From Swiss-Prot:
Domain of life the protein comes from: Bacteria
Protein name (record): UPF0319 protein HI_1681
NCBIfam families: PRK01904.1
Signal peptide limits: 1-21
Biological source species: Haemophilus influenzae (strain ATCC 51907 / DSM 11121 / KW20 / Rd)
Disulfide cysteine pairs (residue numbers): none
Length: 221
């Protein structure tokens, strides 16, 4: 009897401390830009799923992509990045956005993103949603930096533990010296963000692209 009681006690303890993982996916018009402070990998972007811990808060940045209009008036609408923060769940979750059929609807979505998080069985999960405001010449390249600043601000959908997240291929601003690549880390200098970003993306490009850009720059002096 004592042995049985010990076994039952251990089983109860293990059950009470166990964590369960659910899969998170999105509606077809959403793409992941960041997951829990990290850039969404290309392979993950195609699969559009990742695993979450049901005991933790999770945060994703998504963007809505939709072909709007009809016939010769069709165009691609890309929303501003949207932050979604939610509690993990043992059941699979789906992050969804409504279908956008015209640019007016797209503008309304940008002003007030309508994004929901539900379990596969249809139960709504509480989520905090906010727009990730961005500036600069190439805002899409600064998602992680902007997200880290957002998380440090204490805003509505922020998660403080992700505030210190750094970009794997980060842009380091050098106080002096010419822009150069150093062991995979791009080092730039400049008087403003736009100049720094130009230097960063120039160094990311291949030689042919760099040459074409330089020729273009010369022709626009």
């Amino acid at each position: 009897m004592k042995l049985r009681a010990v076994v039952l006690g251990l089983a109860t303890l293990c059950t009470s401390t166990a964590t369960f993982a659910g899969m998170v996916s999105t509606s077809s018009n959403l793409e992941f830009l960041a997951i829990d402070g990290q850039k969404a990998s290309k392979s993950l972007g195609k699969a559009k799923t990742f695993t979450v811990d049901d005991t933790q808060n999770h945060q994703v940045v998504v963007r809505l992509n939709e072909i709007v209009g009809s016939g010769s008036n069709q165009s691609l609408f890309e929303s501003n990045p949207v932050i979604v923060t939610f509690q993990g769940n043992a059941e699979d979750l789906v992050i969804s956005a409504p279908v956008i059929r015209n640019l007016d609807s797209g503008d309304k979505f940008n002003q007030m993103p309508n994004i929901t998080v539900k379990t596969k069985s249809g139960n709504a999960i509480s989520a905090k949603v906010d727009v990730l405001k961005q500036e600069g010449l190439f805002p899409s390249g600064n998602v992680l930096n902007d997200l880290a600043e957002y998380n440090a601000s204490g805003a509505a959908a922020s998660v403080s533990k992700f505030a210190a997240t750094t970009v794997a291929s980060s842009v380091a601003v050098a106080p002096a010296g010419n822009a150069k690549a150093n062991k995979g880390k791009v080092v730039v200098q400049g008087e403003n963000v736009a100049e720094q970003q130009l230097q960063y993306w120039f160094q990311q490009a291949d030689k042919e692209t760099q040459t074409r850009f330089l020729n273009w720059a010369k022709s626009h002096k």
